[in-house]
A protein has these predicted regions:
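Terminal substrate-recognition subdomain of acyl/acetyltransferases
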Residues: 37, 59-126, 230-286
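Acyl-donor binding region in acyl/amide transferases
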Residues: 184, 190-266
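A conserved beta-strand-loop-helix scaffold within acyl/acetyltransferase catalytic domains
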Residues: 131-211
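Short acidic-hydrophobic, aromatic-tinged amphipathic segments that line or gate anion-handling sites
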Residues: 19-23, 67-70, 132-134
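Conserved Lys-Pro-Asp/Glu-containing loop-to-beta segment of HAD-superfamily phosphomonoesterases
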Residues: 31-52, 58
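Short, high-confidence coil segments that cap the C-terminus of an alpha-helix
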Residues: 40-42, 173-174, 234-237
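Extended, hydrophobic alpha-helical segments in both membrane/secreted and soluble proteins
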Residues: 1, 31, 47, 54-55, ...
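Substrate-recognition/cap helix-loop segment adjacent to the acidic, metal-dependent catalytic center
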Residues: 1-22
Length: 286
């Protein structure tokens, strides 16, 4: 870290770096460590190195990581990488602006969990606070972004535009939920969304349920479903229906509906929950 500390004129500051790793370990192993701390997919990572041998090691060990073949002249690096459009985004939300800070906070959580005696104690110690509200106009870019980018915790992998999200918000046939989370280390922001579609016979169908991988294993899904069932009871809804559509990347939620008390309707891929029979989950989100 010495160059950052001693050279105040540097454009890149230490605070700009989410996870700082500087050692003599294999770089592929270091990338694995960073990936675990940040809780992102390898296919979202780019590795830049001026040493061809190091680039080859990472390519062979982590084929999902993008490894550009940099030109020999360092003066050409900037234009070369810029032309690859690796960091382009269709839209830019407030959540993107806060990304580095959020990753730094996540690193602190990872450090803490390594010291915890069990998961329950760890989750209690986070002092998590959740908020679930209908979609609002200010959140539309972030909500649309979640539908476009999220692959792992995504029940049906439906991709929606900002116009689609606005339609759902204004529709009498839909209930919409955006879920925010914060804990003692910081604010996760908007990390999950649920869209329910009203169908015949007093039922709602889970059109979309998406959650950021940053909050996996926190119990957010239990918090969300408890709150939604309360609302469905108030409007005299009898059934909540769901569906899991498999993709190459969403195996993480293959058994989610089973865990959430929805029963599979054989031989179809449809699930059903009787609101009357629902038993609220215990969790550590207040």
């Amino acid at each position: 870290k010495e160059p950052f500390i001693k050279h105040s004129e540097m454009v890149l500051k230490l605070d700009d770096i989410s996870v700082f790793v500087a050692n003599w370990n294999n770089k592929a192993d270091n990338i694995r460590y960073i990936q675990e701390v940040l809780n992102i997919g390898f296919d979202s990572m780019v590795f830049l190195d001026d040493n061809p041998a190091e680039r080859d090691i990472v390519r062979k060990n982590l084929p999902e990581v993008t490894v550009p073949e940099l030109p020999e002249d360092p003066a050409l690096y900037l234009s070369y990488v810029s032309n690859l459009n690796l960091f382009e985004t269709a839209n830019y939300s407030k959540n993107d602006k806060d990304r580095t800070l959020q990753y730094q906070q996540e690193a602190k959580r990872k450090k803490m969990i390594s010291k915890a005696t069990n998961m329950d104690d760890y989750l209690k110690s986070l002092k998590m606070v959740g908020q679930i509200t209908p979609f609002n106009k200010e959140e539309t870019p972030r909500i649309a972004q979640l539908t476009q980018r999220s692959n792992q915790f995504n029940l049906r992998t439906k991709r929606y535009t900002e116009e689609d999200i606005t339609h759902f918000s204004n529709s009498n046939k839909h209930l919409t939920y955006s879920i925010k989370l914060k804990d003692k280390y910081g604010d996760y922001g908007l990390i999950s969304l649920i869209i329910l579609e009203k169908i015949a016979n007093g039922s709602y169908f889970i059109d979309s349920w998406i959650m950021s991988c940053r909050v996996l294993n926190r119990g957010v899904e239990y918090f969300a479903l408890n709150e939604i069932i309360k609302e469905l009871k108030k409007i005299n809804i009898d059934l909540l229906l769901g569906e899991y559509i498999e993709t190459p990347k969403n195996n993480l939620v293959a058994d989610l509906l089973d865990k959430l008390q929805l029963k599979k309707e054989a031989p179809y891929n449809q699930y059903k929950l009787s609101i009357e029979d629902y038993k609220p989950f215990n969790h550590y989100v207040s």
